[in-house]
Amino acid sequence: MQPLSPAFIDQLCFDDIGLIPAISQDWLDGAVLMMAWMNRTALEQTLKSGQVHYWSRSRQELWHKGATSGHTQILKGIRYDCDADVLLLSIEQTGLVSCHTGARSCFFAEVNQHSQGDSLTLPPPMDACSELFRVIDQRHTTPEANSYTNKLLEGGDNRILKKIGEESAEFVMACKDDDEKAIANEAADLLFHLQVALAHHGVNWRDVLEVLANRRGAPRRN
């Protein structure tokens, strides 16, 4: 990432004690990871070092995230909201652990509307393709009876690649027919089977996202 100018800091609206909330988000799959506070010093140190620093309200000191645990956050980008009083940090989370509990995200509890204040422990919200791969990979490591995904994985390359060929042909035909609904459906089927192939070969969906992210803005090949 190119160094960011600290000039924008003067446009931010810090609260009465000089703090601003900062939400960190995974730079690849968009998962919301944690929320903490920054003051001007923390933000300036973040920009200078390229690693995220917060302000600890309990300890009243600068907090270099992950300095002790090793789970540092590498800054990829910063946005602020329309009122300039909340920061959104795009970060690469070292070790994929941002919460002190050992969870990937601090936002792992969702209130169950059918319960009385109980919560369910869930993975962080992320984009649909990343969530789909998470489920596929879970089937890969923890098979479930009568699972279509597991039947594909058990069939190996022969079964998986045959389905990719079939779904590719169906996608092409949908495009030839210019049927928007069919194109969307066939694209979804094709993406699913591509992800099954990735899981079968031990390639993480994040690896694909990282390739795409790194290609963004890169010189085009002839």
Swiss-Prot record:
Coiled coil: none annotated. Keywords: Amino-acid biosynthesis, ATP-binding, Cytoplasm, Histidine biosynthesis, Hydrolase, Multifunctional enzyme, Nucleotide-binding. GO terms for cellular component: cytoplasm. It comes from the Bacteria. The keyword ATP-binding applies. SUPFAM superfamilies: all-alpha NTP pyrophosphatases, HisI-like. It catalyses: 1-(5-phospho-beta-D-ribosyl)-ATP + H2O = 1-(5-phospho-beta-D-ribosyl)-5'-AMP + diphosphate + H(+); 1-(5-phospho-beta-D-ribosyl)-5'-AMP + H2O = 1-(5-phospho-beta-D-ribosyl)-5-[(5-phospho-beta-D-ribosylamino)methylideneamino]imidazole-4-carboxamide. InterPro entries: His_synth_HisIE, HisE, PRA-CH, PRib-ATP_PPHydrolase-like, PRib_AMP_CycHydrolase_dom, PRib_AMP_CycHydrolase_sf. GO terms for biological process: L-histidine biosynthetic process. GO terms for molecular function: ATP binding; phosphoribosyl-AMP cyclohydrolase activity; phosphoribosyl-ATP diphosphatase activity. It is an enzyme of class 3 (hydrolase). It is found in: Cytoplasm. Its EC number is 3.5.4.19, 3.6.1.31. Pfam families: PRA-CH, PRA-PH. Residues 129-222 are annotated as: Phosphoribosyl-ATP pyrophosphohydrolase. Residues 1-128 are annotated as: Phosphoribosyl-AMP cyclohydrolase. Pathway: Amino-acid biosynthesis; L-histidine biosynthesis; L-histidine from 5-phospho-alpha-D-ribose 1-diphosphate: step 2/9; Amino-acid biosynthesis; L-histidine biosynthesis; L-histidine from 5-phospho-alpha-D-ribose 1-diphosphate: step 3/9. In the N-terminal section; belongs to the PRA-CH family. This is Histidine biosynthesis bifunctional protein HisIE. It comes from Prochlorococcus marinus (strain MIT 9313). The gene is hisI.
